[in-house]
Amino acid sequence: MTQRTAFPVTLDEQLCFALYSTSLAMTKAYKPILDRLGLTYPQYLTMLILWESDDVTVKDIAARLNLDSATVTPLLKRLESQGFIERVRGTEDERLVFIRLTRSGVALKRSAREVPGEIFCATQQTPEFLMRLRSDLQQLRGTLNDYLERY
């Protein structure tokens, strides 16, 4: 779709504002749930990555979160000070830093199992609607990332 069309310029009619304000609302909905776990939203996303695949590099985590390593490093330091992860330098290449779950980090996964269900209830939407929305958003993100790579 390369055709240019005139779009409304009011705030409430902007796709970007709908996405931005929904993201803020979603993050706020997570806050009281994650407070019980002692995690912030970015820390929770990081832990989700580690629960999927332990012993990953800082660079890999940053890529999955669409952040740079400099942004992820302080987040990881806080998780380490909480006892959920440990940072280990690579044996073959000391520039690489691997992130590993501690026993506390593994145990935290059990406590976090209820988080998705609580958020699902907060949305008051059907599973089908939310799965379709997630798929549509992932497709939009991919299209935008492709666009950004060209420019």
Question: Language-model segments: which ranges?
Answer:
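Alpha-helical linker/hinge and terminal dimerization helices associated
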Residues: 22, 26-29, 65, 108-126, ...
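N-terminal leader segment of winged-helix/HTH proteins
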Residues: 1-37, 130-131, 147
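Residues within helix-turn-helix
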Residues: 58-59, 70, 77, 97
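C-terminal regulatory/oligomerization modules of transcriptional regulators
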Residues: 1-7, 103, 125-151
